[in-house]
Amino acid sequence: FVNNFDGVILSYQNSKVAQEMTAQAIFGGIGINGTLPVSTKHFSINTGFNTTKIRLGYGIPEEFGVSEFDLYKIDSLANNAIDKKATPGCQILIAKKGQIIFNKSYGFHTYNNKIKVGTDDVYDLASITKVSASLPLLMKMVDEGKLNIDDSLSAHLDLDTSDKGGLIIRDILAHQSRLKSWIPFYRNTLEDDTINGVKVLRDTLYDTQESVLFPYKVAEGIYLHYSYPDSIFKTIKYSELREEKKYKYSDLGYYIFQRILENTYSDKLNNLIDNNFYDRLGMENMGYLPLERMDVNRIIPTEQDYLYRSQLIQGYVHDQGASMLGGVAGHAGVFSNANDLAKLMQMYLNNGDYAEENYISSETLKEFTKYQFPENNNRRALGFDKRALEGKGGATCTSVSVSSFGHTGFTGTIAWVDPEYELIYIFLSNRIHPDAENLKLIRMNVRTDIMQEVYNYFGGK
């Protein structure tokens, strides 16, 4: 019977711990090196083989000298944020040296307290999409010799009739290319008149049914005209540049990067990231267009949108510009739970390797994750955010190392990687439910205060 298998694992016990460790051994979450202490019918004493850890594993804080009780402050901070209505719920994940040692959910999907947040539920990552979809594909282009970050945009797109062709990709990625911060594209698709104080969608641009003319699903029962994504790109193409070449965070470059990526590889952005990264990394929950992959009750809702879509946004991207591209954009649109996002972050932490596969060269990753223009008081790397320069604001607590990198999202999210401490911190929430004007999560410093607690216990070597 045993000869029918390539390998057999002997776990000795049928306990919960033994089952979990055996599963991790099979999938490479832990390495094994045990041998048989006695002979059996099919195997002699000392038979065994060694395997190595190749994927994120699951451990406990005690492996690093921290008891679960020590982490009560994280629970307190999360629950206090929920009590103060900074967010209805959240997910928090900590990984240390390749082991997920903390992965918990708090609160509910909404303030009606009907559906508890589960660790498999997904959040709208907002701008974390930039570093989890656009950036890995841009780094792939660099590795393949299809992109030089010091190229001008004109090397990749026909922009001859505008002033955008001379913009340098490195400057765009570091947010100092003079592009505007954002453009509210949706406003030009609304009628001037209102009904009961609510703006009305132009019937020449929207329909309630999908068709060849109206293929882009913006939200439930709202489809945008096929020509409008080109109108968005044209608006960016001819938008006015800022006068000074200084740091100014901008989404607009990622609309441009999406077009470059899709032109280069002749495929849609969601297919590119799925085929080249998410599927290969074993992600079951992460990706664009979550309603095509899971039940709506696993998707955390964001805003009750009164300005544009006149509905609760659930299963559709919150960002209006991304929604006008059918939910797939370079700057927003990816949904995930903390566990899947951690796999991508671990790949970054492993210098581009995961599960014995290389995704990005270490040289490219090193270039993309280092400060680019600190002399301009610009803390950004290429796409990634970094620790603040000389304590001047920023997205992190003060304990992160200078080598660390990550990104935040408007919906109330952060994913951060710290190579010096082999540490990953992820916080996901829907702080904009039901109103994007809710700034309590930001003003209460919830993400950074929890991050500081993580570093208090796991920031050592």
Regions found by a protein language model. Name each.
Residues 84-91, 113-174, 240-253, 329-332:
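Short active-site loop at a secondary-structure junction
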Residues 10, 91-93, 171-173, 287, ...:
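Structural recognition of the beta-strand scaffold that forms the well-ordered cores
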Residues 103-106, 182-188, 288-289, 428, ...:
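Short, solvent-exposed loop/turn and secondary-structure capping segments
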Residues 404, 411-424:
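Short, surface-exposed beta-strand/loop micro-motifs that present aromatic residues
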Residues 1-65:
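C-terminal non-catalytic regions of proteins with extracellular/luminal or membrane-system context
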Residues 36-45, 50-52, 67, 350, ...:
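Short, gly/Ser/Thr-rich active-site loops of penicillin-recognizing serine hydrolases
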Residues 65-125, 146-148, 319, 436-437:
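Short, conserved catalytic-motif segment at the N-terminal edge
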Residues 166-402:
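Short, surface-exposed loop or secondary-structure junction motifs
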